[in-house]
Structures are given as structure tokens and as C-alpha cells.
Amino acid sequence: MYSLIYITTSGEEESKKIAKILLEERTVACANIIPSMKSFYWWEGKIEEDAESILILKTRSDKLDTLIRRVKDIHSYDIPCILEVSIQNGSEDYLKWLEDSLQG
């Protein structure tokens, strides 16, 4: 099974850094970056507002534990948002490419 991983970062440069490391290590097959968004969230008892970047990764579900550990090592946040969305179905050609890309 395959997964989309949703991560928020402090900005585009951090998203690029994480994406490149995970691609080089073949933990992910593909990374998409949405360079800028606004986030509102609770932190230490008050509502915060920050500019962030979105990093979307595509990988096999069995790589998730490794991916989470690695992102936590690299990420600048104390508690990074790392969420998995299972891919239930998709283009067979794309999923084959994804699998082949993870093999190296």
C-alpha cells in the first residue's frame, strides 16, 4: 500500500531540505511543495499565526516509521505535523513508477 504524507514546515527552504534528503535516501519517490500558506494554531495556551510551507510526500506505507523518525531528526519544529493519508487506489502506471522509484 502507498501513502501521501502531509508535513508543514517553517518555509520553502526547509521543505526543500527535507524533500531532498528523503529523496536521496529513497524514503520517498516524489515530493511536492506548496511554498506559502497561513497557519493558525494553539501553542502554549494562545492562538498563534504563522507563515508556513506544505510538503507532500509519496511513499510506500512500510516506509512510514523510517520517514517519521527521519523528519523529526531534520525538522526545526519541536512537534512537527507529520500526517499520513493512505492511498486506496490510483493510476496503475503511476503506482508502478512510485514503486520503481523507491527501489532505485
Annotate each language-model stretch with its function.
Residues 1-104:
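Positively charged, small/polar-rich N-terminal and surface patches that mediate targeting and assembly
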